[in-house]
Amino acid sequence: HTGIWTTVLALASLTTTQGAIDYSEPRPFGEATEFAKDCDNLAIGEWWTVDAKTVGARSGGATEHGDWFKTVDRSKALAFALYTHDHSVLKISGQCFPLKPDEPKSVTLEFKQNGSWVKVQEQPVLYPGWSIHFRIEDWDNSVDVPYRLRLGELSSFEGLIRKDPKDKDTIVVASLNCNSPREEEFDTRKQIVANLRQHDPDLLFFAGDQNYTHDESTFGWLQFGVQFADIMKDRPTICIPDDHDIGHGNLWGEGGKASLGTKGAADGGYMYPASFVNMVERQQTWNLPDPYDATPVKQGIGV
């Protein structure tokens, strides 16, 4: 299987360069509306100083468990990853907990070759949202390949890129949705994950409402990801955001128009700013196969 390693070596020095990212920006979604000024507070600016009890009534379990970010073992700062591969394109998203000023802000993707880790790409941690994204073309989907994401020397996360199960008579898909935080298992789903492992699905499909923390979306997304990291790390995963993922009680999308936020946004569109919606979509869906038509809808919201 030399093809995959030819690709790896060709990409070994590839790094996406972007303009300087201000990881301490206190208003990354702007100040045009109250929704823009009051979202993702537990994961932006000087997040380590925020009193979780002040983040608002719409944040569900984030208020009750809001100090979670402050107590995370920093060796686990790189929390989880999810991927798909389709038509010879591998797409991987990694997710960090909010990072402190003196911690690394880029992540390296490595594949294991002949027992050794080989660097493929290095990409910046994006802000807001603290996600990282890798795209590998000419992917050989006929072999299993171990992968590792490394946040400098601080933290790492390992998994397996599974080969395409085209030799199987039956493809097993695990479908889950509506991951309520209102229970004792705050950051685990031990029984569910154990049962999933018994079925060993070829594909995971999370059909929406991965969290219910509304305006504290990064908090809820990390809660979800930590809960399911052990099953997502070694098989393709599809996540599709629904209403609660972007802070709504119902999803009124309406081509991406802006909502005034009254009566549950029943006037149509999105209550939260497009930059917030795009952050959620980036966190949850960047790893999906490329869309047939990538033209954004109104406000520049992605598809």
Which residues make up each language-model segment?
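Metal-dependent phosphoester/phosphodiester hydrolase catalytic core
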Residues: 21-303
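Boundary at the C-terminal end of the N-terminal hydrophobic targeting segment
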Residues: 17-19
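Cleavable N-terminal signal peptides of Sec/SRP-targeted secreted and luminal proteins
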Residues: 6-12
